[in-house]
A protein has these predicted regions:
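Conserved glycine-rich cofactor-binding loop
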Residues: 11-13
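Active-site helix of classical SDR
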Residues: 118, 152, 160
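Substrate-binding pocket helix/loop in short-chain dehydrogenase/reductase
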Residues: 94-95, 99-107, 200
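Residue(s) in the substrate-gating loop at a strand-loop-helix junction
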Residues: 136
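Alpha-helical segment proximal to the catalytic Tyr-Lys
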Residues: 123, 165-169, 228
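Short, small/polar-rich loop/turn modules that mediate ligand/substrate recognition or access, typified
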Residues: 84, 168, 173, 230-232
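Conserved glycine-rich Rossmann-like NAD(P)H-binding loop of the short-chain dehydrogenase/reductase
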Residues: 26-41
Length: 277
């Protein structure tokens, strides 16, 4: 019988790539997203491949969304085997520039919604089911800016670890991937910045930049029966960025420019050991 995966943020970026990989490997997809136009891409892809798909245009932070998403899977396919919590948002702001509304937005979308979706999916799961949470390398190591983002993604790793321990004895696995920065609608503005792009390249030992397809391969592997003895793990998909203290030869010999007076890129005035404000 065909396995069924529920994917959030399925209309673009990593979510669309994950959905494509599932369909290509004969896994039916229930795609969730806010934008019907983006979900239409997934529907067109499924039609092209001749594979089954169901979509639901809904904000996953809404109270009724988790139950509606799981109900759609059961109604259309009679089962649910995998949940991929992928929906996310990015913001390049450090903690002292992040207001409560932004903090709530990030925690609601990238921690509370995955928690509630997992809770609903677990009620429908049987042995052999799995959850794959899409976290970030910035949940593993510190980085500049993105305070709310890092906090939410790190919380997602904590949730992953708990669920692996709690539900492993029922044959339900929970794992996470931690992607580096790959080109998506959410990250394109950062990758267009020459300084960020060079920093990312100089700190990555692999010989190329990552893609959404790289992340999709990892997600779909962890969701598959082939990963049946993998539980509670975080797989960094970043070309070695997070685990190796690496600088390219060009960066090693580069001269560090002096910092100009005033605020630095870290958000603190040079020489100021007090609180930013």
């Amino acid at each position: 019988m065909m396995r069924v995966a529920l994917v959030t943020g399925a209309g673009s970026g990593i979510g669309l790539a994950v959905s494509r990989k599932f369909l290509q490997t004969d896994v039916a997809v229930v795609g969730i997203g806010r934008d019907p136009a983006k979900l239409a891409r997934l529907e067109a892809l499924a039609a092209e491949l001749g594979k089954p798909v169901a979509t639901l245009a809904v904000d996953v932070t809404q109270d009724a969304a988790p139950a509606a998403a799981v109900a759609l899977a059961i109604e259309r396919f009679g089962r649910l085997d995998c949940l991929v919590n992928n929906a996310g948002v990015g913001s390049p702001k450090p903690v002292h520039e992040t207001d409560d509304a932004t903090l709530d937005q990030f925690l609601d979308l990238m921690l509370r919604a995955p928690f509630r979706l997992a809770r609903e999916a677990l009620r429908a799961f049987g042995p052999g089911s799995s959850i794959v949470n899409v976290a970030s390398t910035y949940a593993l190591v510190g980085g500049l800016r993105g305070g709310a983002y890092s906090a939410a993604k790190a919380g997602l790793l904590g949730l992953t670890s708990h669920m692996a321990a709690q539900y492993g004895s029922a044959g339900i696995r929970s794992n996470a991937v931690a992607p580096g920065v790959v080109p998506t609608d959410m990250t394109i503005h950062r990758l267009q910045d020459q300084g960020f792009r060079r920093m990312n390249d100089d700190m990555t030992p692999s010989d190329r930049r990552g893609t959404v397809e790289d992340v999709a391969e990892a997600v779909c592997f962890l969701a598959s029966p082939a990963a049946g003895w993998i539980n509670g793990q975080v797989l960094a998909v970043d070309g070695g960025w997070s685990s190796i203290k690496f600088l390219s030869e060009e960066a090693l010999v580069a001269e560090r420019l002096p910092v100009q007076p005033g605020w630095t890129h870290s958000g603190r005035a040079r020489g100021d050991r007090g609180q930013p404000g």
